[in-house]
Amino acid sequence: MGSGSSSYRPKAIYLDIDGRIQKVIFSKYCNSSDIMDLFCIATGLPRNTTISLLTTDDAMVSIDPTMPANSERTPYKVRPVAIKQLSAGVEDKRTTSRGQSAERPLRDRRVVGLEQPRREGAFESGQVEPRPREPQGCCQEGQRIPPEREELIQSVLAQVAEQFSRAFKINELKAEVANHLAVLEKRVELEGLKVVEIEKCKSDIKKMREELAARSSRTNCPCKYSFLDNHKKLTPRRDVPTYPKYLLSPETIEALRKPTFDVWLWEPNEMLSCLEHMYHDLGLVRDFSINPVTLRRWLFCVHDNYRNNPFHNFRHCFCVAQMMYSMVWLCSLQENFSQMDILILMTAAICHDLDHPGYNNTYQINARTELAVRYNDISPLENHHCAVAFQILAEPECNIFSNIPPDGFKQIRQGMITLILATDMARHAEIMDSFKEKMENFDYSNEEHMTLLKMILIKCCDISNEVRPMEVAEPWVDCLLEEYFMQSDREKSEGLPVAPFMDRDKVTKATAQIGFIKFVLIPMFETVTKLFPMVEEIMLQPLWESRDRYEELKRIDDAMKELQKKTDSLTSGATEKSRERSRDVKNSEGDCA
């Protein structure tokens, strides 16, 4: 604004008129002729007089808009040179031109203003006649205004017009500044909206990435349920699933009842047939009037809602359900459990990890995922597994409990929720302590005791891989570590805490399993052995052997690391000696030279 206003600043020139200082102000838009006329008016000379300006040291000054400004102490002297004789036509033409220029927006840009003389005095003798003083007051009617008076009036009018013009210019500048501020405020507002939009886009991109990862890791089935989309509903197939009904051999049926069953030998369709066989073999289809076609649809829909994670996938679901099935036969659970309890145990085992995303509860809570927010950080995955299970069962085509009375369904629902939530390892110590208290006086007729026992049973089945033979159990360790590493890599990239047992730079297969077997698996199965002694030989003995095997593997790993350190130390020492020899040789060569 400062530079803008300075462009309209007029120039002031001080004239010495016979000892009287006259200040003349004119705009930079005036031309030389206009400035000369203004000086003539100021000195009282006719307008057509040619004058010259002299400095205090009698140097001539060019009369034009770029002439140097002076001060009261160094005024210019005005010296008339000649008077121009103009014809009437030329004078009229100049007058007309002057009248037209007065109509311009800046009101005859020539004259800005005059100041009254500060000091009075006489003109130098021998020069032009002094200008007569005008009488006070207005002219009488009919009296012609003298040219000098007319010029003075024109000058005053020009000054007033210039002031008005400047005022209008200031208003225009104010309006321009106001408009500029409005534009800036609008830009600030738009930038703020952009920030909000960017954050929303980041959130949408994150959701899209998770959805794409979920889609790529799962089979293409119309009955998908994703926790990323609340509006997606299950649309189970209304036709009979097309997987073939395998006729299981007696050897397979016998092996299926044992914990040593090799779960890696079977394709998904074969595993579905095995699960279907379990429901028939345990009498659940008969006792609860389950429609065989509905059972197949339900199993197929469950299969399609397990993701293709390295560990938490449909094969893991089958592994847990098969271990539960084998424990029913090994421990003769049907002698002390009702068929309703067996149905709850088997169905909860099948549904316990539905739609598992491959990232555990710790990640869900630290990353503040939708599941953690929805379930308030309380077992978000286990709550989600329950929700998906009952959303599938809510579809008539998949409701295997459709012929069970409402009270019975309520009991099944409550039992399944209790068991699936018990698979959260964060509750392991709490559940174990409660079960140990009840073990002293365990009562099969006590509902609380039975509920705790069922919770322990599903926990045993969920983490029972090391109970199986080494060739069956060991691949599961690789799968679990792969899923752990996938999570820890993502946690590192997102700046989240990383558990040491998941960090690929810190954990090995041996270190990952030794602590888990010694402090989680063995104590839990030892507690179960007190109720079911037959578990010791079939399940506890393999755990002891597995612990010993991994401890031996750890000793080998430690020995290899120690050997590697020694090798590295020797290599570095040899390298240093070689460098010393090279330096000695160079020094000796230098001495010889």
Swiss-Prot record:
Protein's pathway: Purine metabolism; 3',5'-cyclic GMP degradation; GMP from 3',5'-cyclic GMP: step 1/1
Gene Ontology BP terms: cAMP-mediated signaling; cGMP catabolic process; cGMP metabolic process; positive regulation of cardiac muscle hypertrophy
Cofactor(s) this protein cannot do without: Zn(2+); Mg(2+)
CDD domains named among the record's database cross-references: HDc
A Gene Ontology cellular-component term: perinuclear region of cytoplasm
List of residues binding Mg(2+): D353
Main location: membrane
Function statement: Specifically hydrolyzes the second messenger cGMP, which is a key regulator of many important physiological processes. Highly specific: compared to other members of the cyclic nucleotide phosphodiesterase family, has the highest affinity and selectivity for cGMP. Specifically regulates natriuretic-peptide-dependent cGMP signaling in heart, acting as a regulator of cardiac hypertrophy in myocytes and muscle. Does not regulate nitric oxide-dependent cGMP in heart.
Name this protein carries in UniProt: High affinity cGMP-specific 3',5'-cyclic phosphodiesterase 9A
Provenance organism: Pan troglodytes (Chimpanzee)
